[in-house]
Amino acid sequence: MKKYLFLPILCFLSMLATAQNTQKQPFKGVIGNAEYRIYIKMNLYENNVTVPGQEIFGELPGFMGDSIDSRKWLFTSAKIHKNTAQLAITNDYGSEDLVATLTLNKDNTYTLKQVEGSNMKIARQRKWKKLPKTLVFFPKE
């Protein structure tokens, strides 16, 4: 009987510890935007994210990637203040750069807002498509 009680309690404690870890470090992990088929992989605490296929850039705070195209927008620096991070972002060619904020919202979504600099673009059907200045991202499980 004790075995049957111990297992559910252990599972509950494990889930609780995982939930607390994501709340303590909300700017670590992967978030996505299904409408534009883009995602952000980040660890703004340890700055130890490597861009797949572009390891020459070394470890970074994170990047925004595209599910359709291999181009990336690299986070070159990040400063966290409460539930908002200020990001310096450049494309993987280094030809365009911008400053943006990434905010954790109360509903556990994230808002990326381009503050100044170049417009973020993605490639669609052999043409550049500008992304909106404000994008909402959802945590990926």
Give each language-model segment a name.
Residues N21-V99, N105, Y110, V115, ...:
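Central antiparallel beta-sheet cores of small beta-barrel/beta-sandwich binding domains
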